[in-house]
């Protein structure tokens, strides 16, 4: 953002919501924003080049995360990713008959809360646990909400509005103890 010489440059503190790209990421992405923009699902030469680059990126991300490339799904952003994770896990569990319970907090990103609202209308059990006055998940309330039918627990690592950092190690321990089959989404 350009600023007149006599004005202070603003300091943007909401890095939990968006963060400037690292120079290496800009360099790796720029060719696909400025020229090599083929549809990776197509069959022509430009599309095949885009698909090769996409699959190469998938392998790099998979290696960094210690998973297989087939486990890496790229989305357009956080909202789409939250919807996919929460709804996908819930519907997969229901189709496998492993449970129908979803646990989240009242302090989650709206993409998670709206996904939970939709799933609740579709017959899933949704528990929305409280947070402390400091914005930290109430671990006792979380523990009470977990049971053997819980299939996904969603607790955001860092709140994008006030910056509280959740105790995910403690959350994960509770999930392992009380709902061992549940996925932890953050």
Report residues per predicted region.
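Pyridoxal 5′-phosphate
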Residues: 1-186
């Amino acid at each position: 953002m350009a600023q007149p010489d006599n004005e202070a440059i603003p300091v943007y503190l909401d890095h939990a919501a968006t963060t400037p790209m690292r120079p290496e990421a800009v360099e790796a992405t720029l060719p696909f924003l400025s020229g090599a923009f083929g549809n990776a699902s197509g069959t022509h030469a430009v599309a095949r080049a885009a698909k090769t680059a996409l699959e190469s990126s998938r392998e790099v991300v998979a290696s960094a995360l210690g998973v297989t490339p087939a486990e890496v799904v790229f989305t357009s952003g956080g909202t789409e990713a939250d919807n996919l994770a929460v709804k996908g896990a819930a519907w997969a569990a229901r189709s496998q008959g492993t449970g129908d319970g979803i646990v989240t907090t009242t302090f989650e990103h709206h993409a998670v809360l709206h996904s939970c609202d939709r799933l609740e209308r579709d017959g899933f059990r949704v528990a929305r646990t409280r947070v402390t006055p400091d914005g930290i998940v109430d671990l006792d309330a979380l523990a009470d909400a977990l049971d053997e039918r819980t299939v996904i627990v969603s607790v955001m690592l860092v709140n994008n509005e006030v910056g509280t950092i959740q105790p995910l190690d403690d959350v994960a321990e509770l999930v392992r103890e009380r709902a061992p089959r549940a996925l932890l989404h953050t």
